Each structure stands twice: as C-alpha cells, then as structure tokens.
Regions:
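Active-site cores of enzymes that catalyze phosphoryl transfer or operate on phosphate-rich substrates
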Residues: 1-100, 158, 181, 267-269, ...
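Exposed, low-structure sequence patches enriched in small/polar residues
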Residues: 24-26, 32, 121, 125-375
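Primarily recognizes Gram-negative and organellar outer-membrane beta-barrels
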Residues: 21, 51-76, 82, 100-105, ...
Length: 375
C-alpha cells in the first residue's frame, strides 16, 4: 500500500479530473536482524510526499479548475519480531503497523500477537494469531489452526477464525470481508510407498463452514479429493463437492443498499488425468460439471468446463505450458447496479432507487500461455 494511487482527500464540491497514478516515496529504510538469543526482528519505515490533483467545479455558471491536495505527507511504519520457545521450530511473535498523515488527526494502526508450536517431532502443529485495528473504532480478529500428521498414512487438521464489523486494515493492507466467522476440518489418507500399479495415492475429505454473526451461513462445503500416481508416471484424479443452500453477502460490499441473497444448493464434479510426467510433453485434459438444484424455479443451470493443458519441456531449464478451456456458465441473481429512480421500489434519505439483478449466460474460450526459465 506504500506508494499506491493517492486517494485520501476528496473534494466536497466538484470532481477530480486529473491526478497521479502513484504516490512518490521520498525515503524508505529497512532493518533486519537477529540477536544471539534467537530473536528475529524487522522494521520498515517510509515517507511519502504530497500529491495534488486537478479539481473541476462550477462557480457562478463558469467551469473552473484548481489544484487540490489529495494526499498529504505521510509516514508508514511496520515492525515485527519473533522469539523461539520450547524448541527451534516454535515461536511467538508480535507485529505493529502505523500510518500517520501530516496535519490529520486520523488513527490508522494495528497490532498482532501470534504463535507457532511444533511438537512431537513436528507431527503436531498449533498456530494462531489475535489482532486489533485502531481506526475511528477498534476492530478485532483472530484465527487458529491445529493439525497432526501421522508418519505412516493419515493427517487431520482443523481451523477457525473470526472478524468483527469494525475490523479494518485498509489503511496499510488489503481489506477482506469482515464481520464474519469460518471453521473447517480435513482428514487426509495417503499411501506413500508403491503397491501394485500405484506409486502413491492421496485421499482427502474437507468440510468448510463460514457465516455472519447474525446466524446466516455463507459457505457450507463438503469436498472429496482423490489423486492417484501410477507406476508408469501417469496421474488420475477426481474431485467431488456438495454444497447445501447458503447466503451470499458479496454485494453489500459493493453497495450497502444491496441484498444478501440465497444461493441454491449445488454439486460439482471434476475429473482429470495426466500423461507421463517424465516425458518432454505432458497432456492433462479435464472436465468440470456443476449442477444446481434451483430455488423457487430459479436455477443458474448446469455449468460445464472442458479443458486441456499441454506442458512442453524442451530442456531441463525451460518449460512451456498452454492451458485452454471452453466454459459454459449460466447464472442467476447476478449483481448489476443500484439505479436511482423517482418510481423506485426502495427508498432512503437520498431518495428512491431500484436494485437490479439479472440472469446471466457466459460462454467463453480461455487460453493461457506460460514459460518458466530456471537458472
């Protein structure tokens, strides 16, 4: 976020018609180190300059322009340290960020404490963090994860997290949706040693739940993933998903007047195989099917995707890949816009408006090219 497009001040009248695409960084410093006791620390501090834009406004029926201060002088600070505990692979840590803008009494700080415990010869791992953001109001968030990996053939993991409606890291980071919670669990079974026609096999079952603090469930996903590696170095995989009805709150982050909508139950299947990975070329075709159950005779319809990835390895250091797919993705309740109208169905202090959603049908061909060169 340091040096991003200036956007702090907005004019109370008129509009900005021209402005810089980035903020000038006047100075920056980074300090990294480690003490004899094993404490690792890092500090970043940067100062950015003033940035002006051109404001266009009306005065007595005449269009005028002037310089407008969009971004004042600002100081960015990030500090982090970790300390080993119990063993060399377990740590506790602390992190702080602060943004101060010249001439502005606006708080923008955050603090985080975290831990990582690796026990029982790294088979058991427990990690988590708890953080607060200090802006106009204080927000809080936290998460944790506990896992155990058996040396022979299985692994289990569980995780959970939350954020309240005042959690906001947008000043120094990238804000994700707040005011929600999530939890999940995964069981994995594996065969690491060759047996019969298989080099190894992996089976995982994962359950993921998330929702809002008012009780609405926004994700309810059960997933099964099965992958097989054969002795001829071919691969085959299948992935299946079951998703009961949930609610979708994405649109309220576009516009607070939008709806939280109900999404239909759906099921998905993904089948793929790949040819010998030791050859100079590898083919990986796949097929995806997504079947919806519909809500009150509204259904997005079956979604399909057919694709092929071709990987070429002319040398040991150069790899080309071409990934092409054909998608057919119908949908319903797709957000369009909020339209102000004197005859609008809804109203607030600014007047009447309509909220527009639409059914969609997307058919497209995607092709991605990639080249990797190793030195």
């Amino acid at each position: 976020r340091i040096g991003r497009r200036p956007n702090f001040n907005e004019p109370s009248s008129g509009e900005i018609v021209d402005q810089p695409n980035e903020t000038t960084i006047l100075s920056a410093a980074k300090v990294l180190g480690q003490t004899e006791s094993g404490i690792k620390y890092g500090i970043i501090n940067a100062v950015t300059g003033q940035e002006y834009g051109t404001r266009e406004f009306e005065s007595n029926g005449i269009t005028k322009k002037d310089r407008f201060l969009i971004e004042p002088y600002s100081n960015y600070f990030v500090g982090r340290f970790t300390k080993p505990i119990v063993n060399d692979l377990s740590t506790v840590g602390f992190m702080a960020t602060d943004l101060h803008r010249s001439g502005q009494n606006v708080k923008a700080s955050s603090f985080k404490g975290d831990w990582l415990l690796n026990l029982m010869e790294n088979r058991l791992e427990f990690t988590g963090e708890y953080a607060t953001t200090i802006n106009e109001e204080n927000g809080y968030a936290g998460r944790l994860r506990l896992s155990y990996r058996d040396p022979s053939f299985w692994e289990i993991a569980t995780w959970a997290g939350f954020s309240d409606n005042k959690w906001n890291v947008n000043a120094m980071g990238f804000q994700q949706k707040n005011n929600n919670w999530y939890s999940g669990a995964r069981l994995s079974l594996r065969r690491d040693k060759p047996k019969g026609i298989f080099l190894n096999q992996n089976l995982s079952i994962r359950l993921w739940l998330s929702g809002l603090h008012n009780g609405m469930i926004t994700r309810n996903n059960l997933e099964l993933d099965f992958e097989n590696n054969f002795t001829n170095y071919w691969n085959f995989g299948i992935k299946a998903e079951i998703n009961p009805e949930t609610y979708v709150d994405d649109d309220i982050y576009r516009d607070s007047r939008a709806f939280i909508i109900k999404d239909e139950a759906w099921r998905a299947l993904n089948i793929w195989f790949a040819t010998d990975r030791t050859k100079k070329y590898i083919l990986r075709p796949y097929y995806k099917l997504n079947v919806g159950d519909g809500i009150a005779n509204n259904s997005r319809g079956d979604q399909t995707e057919l694709g092929l990835r071709l990987t070429l390895k002319p040398t040991n250091t150069v790899t080309f890949s071409v990934n092409s797919s054909i998608e057919d993705r119908p949908g319903f309740m797709q957000w369009v816009d909020v339209v102000e109208s004197d005859a609008g169905r809804f109203s607030d202090s600014d007047g009447k408006y309509d909220i527009v959603y639409a059914k969609t049908k997307r058919r497209q061909i995607n092709t991605k090219l990639r080249m990797n060169i190793a030195f």
